[in-house]
Amino acid sequence: MADSVAAGLGDENETENEDKEREKRLFSGVKKMEKQAAASDVTETLGFYERKAKCKDRKTNVSDLSLVRFISAELTRGYFLEHNEAKYTERRERVYTCLRIPKELEKLMIFGYFLCLDVFLYVFTLLPLRVLLALVRLLTLPCCGLSGSRILQPAQVCDVLKGFIMVLCYFMMHYVDYSMMYHLIRGQSVIKLYIIYNMLEVADRLFSSFGQDILDALYWTATEPKERKRAHIGVIPHFFMAVLYVFLHAILIMVQATTLNVAFNSHNKSLLTIMMSNNFVEIKGSVFKKFEKNNLFQMSNSDIKERFTNYTLLLIVCLRNMEQFSWNPDHLWVLFPDVCMVIASEIAVDVVKHAFITKFNDITADVYSEYRASLAFDLVSSRQKNAYTDYSDSVSRRMGFIPLPLALLLIRVVTSSVKIQGSLSIVCVLLFYLGMITLKVLNSIVLLGKSCMYVKEANMEEKLFQNPPSAAPSRVSSRAHRTKHTREPPGDPAEEGMSASVTTQPTQQDECPAPQIPTSESDQFLTTPDESEEKSLIQDDSELKHRAPKKDLLEIDRFTICGNRID
């Protein structure tokens, strides 16, 4: 009994203990839940404040991107040019090149202008004397009984032909009425005159391109050895073709001068302004095209010829105007501003054109000294013993400047403007002629000295002693062409020297040489040694169309410059 009671009390105590433990568990669970709830409330509160702080930071960042801060950043922003040093150095060199272009270009222009002046004065001074000497030889040679030699040398034959062409064309020009042409052109509208002037410029370039070919064909036909097979139409047809060409070209230049005279005498000067604006259109047609060194040389030669021709046209216009005003010196000052304006516009257009062409094509200003040396080489080589052409013809081939039509027009204008009456007038004419001869001789001496200096600076002396090349389709000429390219012994040039080669007269060649077509001696000059090796590999029996393309400055002639359009 006692055991059962004790067991029952023990069970009750266990149940009580279990209940107490449950209550403790429940109470501890409630406390945990309260703690968790309190902790969650604290976390939500902290998140709210954090979000609030982030919003405040965002508001402060937005306030930092204000207009004042942007302007401040733009004003204080820095950069470093030395990070692209090569680019900026190149740009600076381009600026320096553009600044050097006017000086170097005008050096070339002045040198080329005096070359054209030398050729132009030759027609008035030395050519009549050479023709007179040739005629004296022609008349006195049969009396001397020299039957085995030529009656006239080839150079004398060419001089006589030039003289006859000038005389015939001069008498033909008397049938052209300058006054009627002036009033006919003056009655046209401004637009018509502008179109006419542009057409005349194009026609002048075409005449210059084809005219020298006609004259060269006449000279070669008249001096070709008689033993050759007849492959031409004869000297007389060639002579009449040359006379017709010089006459038509002279009329063309007369129309140009008349149009310019009408522009000078217009009341509002609108035509003169339009004609001057035509020069600036030339910038558009030339600047934005690809140019190489040879193309720029062609354009430079064309600009020299154009400038000399324009100056001569201005002289003709001034003579005609002074004649109309009875040689009143006050009227000369009326023409002076217009003349200066035309000259200034011509110089400005040339400078701007060449400056931007060299800039866009990465050509240095030193290239103009090479062009000047090439022109000087022609002058020096024409004074050698083995010279194959007269210098006037060389300038005509190089620049496209043919002096005969322009000289013929100037003679026509001067003889119609100046009346020679009495012995005093004849004395004045003789003194003026002696003055022109003096000017021609002094100009030739100075040009020859300068040319020798330029050739020496360019290291082109050795090219002066090389024989002129030749080319012909036959095998004989091909063999002769190969022998021409062989180098001469080094002792021969040393014995003669440059000074002797430019002062002695050409020696007489055999009357029956191998069939050859004379070409420019300057074709021998090469700017790079690689070109000489390439040129030696060309087949000698190839025709003109199979020749290698021209790469050298001395090979550039008027065949490609008269159009003045380089694609």
Curated annotation (Swiss-Prot):
Task: List all Polar residues biased stretches.
Answer: 500-510, 517-529
- Residue ranges for the region (Disordered) are 1-23, 465-543
Per the database entry, which stretches of residues form a coiled coil?
none
Q: Which BP terms in the Gene Ontology apply to this protein?
A: cartilage development; cell projection organization; cranial skeletal system development; developmental pigmentation; lens morphogenesis in camera-type eye; neural crest cell development; ossification; positive regulation of bone development
Q: Which domain of life is it from?
A: Eukaryota
Could you state one GO cellular component term attached to this entry?
Answer: endoplasmic reticulum membrane
**What broad class describes the main subcellular location of this protein?**
cytoplasm
| Topology class, membrane | Multi-pass membrane protein
Regions of compositional bias (Basic and acidic residues) in chain numbering: 534-543
Compositionally biased region (Low complexity)? 468-477
Q: Which UniProt keywords apply?
A: Cell projection, Chondrogenesis, Cilium, Cilium biogenesis/degradation, Cytoplasm, Cytoskeleton, Developmental protein, Differentiation, Membrane, Osteogenesis, Transmembrane, Transmembrane helix
> Where would you find the membrane-spanning parts of this chain?
108-128, 165-185, 233-253, 332-352, 400-420, 426-446
Compartments in which it is found: Cytoplasm, Cytoskeleton, Microtubule organizing center, Centrosome; Cytoplasm, Cytoskeleton, Cilium basal body; Membrane
Family of the protein in this entry: Belongs to the TAPT1 family.
Function of the molecule:
Plays a role in primary cilia formation. Involved in cartilage and bone development. May play a role in the differentiation of cranial neural crest cells. May act as a downstream effector of hoxc8 during development.
Protein name (record)? Transmembrane anterior posterior transformation protein 1 homolog
